[in-house]
């Protein structure tokens, strides 16, 4: 039997009883990082309440196998479905497997080979941040992690805002972001969604948990003077009516080289990138003249 287990996103007390029961009886662990999973089991075993009810939570005769985005396909190509006749747990470093973490390819494998599996509910930053945002909408769009590079990130934001333009009601967008790119992402969001409100959550469930709410520019100002180390969740409220053409017009106003702008415009409009490139060059030449 294959189990997808939620792990605490910061507070060890958020582990569930069902997860503890499965952890105690599993023989094999497929882990995003084996070191992190072993440490989690060690910490759980040190808790007197947990160790009393689950004395074998950190039994030594376990097999820990790395399973992450860099090796998942190779791993699945090498094993036989009979491998899953054992009791096997799938664990990410924190939160729910398959939710911006390894696991989805394994679910697909289980479905393809008619394997039994179970997904246990539990802690995750996505729903925790949305519920903490105070935005009244009962739905949200999950965008996961944005691209690392600014031009790809801006294009992704434009596409998301364009998609939301066709919805009748407000739909908050939830992003995950690292501290290394947080301020850059906020600058891009402010350029493309200026005036919109944002809820930013730092280090959810941890000792230094912090909430910020306001217009994007206000949060940028606050965070430029703050310690931003830690994991972040951003919830953007598209409270203004966005016209479908907004994405293209916003793109054309960006201070980008003509070649990059042409490629991004081509991706949005299905036009020829080379023709658009020469068109942008002519426009810039006219402006200079």
Curated annotation (Swiss-Prot):
Gene3D superfamilies reported for this sequence: Cobalt-precorrin-4 Transmethylase, Domain 1, Methyltransferase, Cobalt-precorrin-4 Transmethylase, Domain 2
GO cellular component: cytoplasm
Known catalytic reactions: cytidine(1402) in 16S rRNA + S-adenosyl-L-methionine = 2'-O-methylcytidine(1402) in 16S rRNA + S-adenosyl-L-homocysteine + H(+)
GO molecular function, one term: rRNA (cytosine-2'-O-)-methyltransferase activity
Compartment(s): Cytoplasm
Cysteine-cysteine disulfides: none
Top-level division of the source organism's lineage: Bacteria
Keywords carried by this UniProt record: Cytoplasm, Methyltransferase, rRNA processing, S-adenosyl-L-methionine, Transferase
Pfam families the UniProt entry points to: TP_methylase (PF00590)
EC number: 2.1.1.198
InterPro entries per UniProt: 4pyrrol_Mease, 4pyrrol_Methylase_sf, 4pyrrole_Mease_sub1, 4pyrrole_Mease_sub2, rRNA_ssu_MeTfrase_I, SAM_MeTrfase_RsmI_CS
Function description: Catalyzes the 2'-O-methylation of the ribose of cytidine 1402 (C1402) in 16S rRNA.
PANTHER family linked to this entry: RIBOSOMAL RNA SMALL SUBUNIT METHYLTRANSFERASE I
Homology family: Belongs to the methyltransferase superfamily. RsmI family.
Name of protein: Ribosomal RNA small subunit methyltransferase I
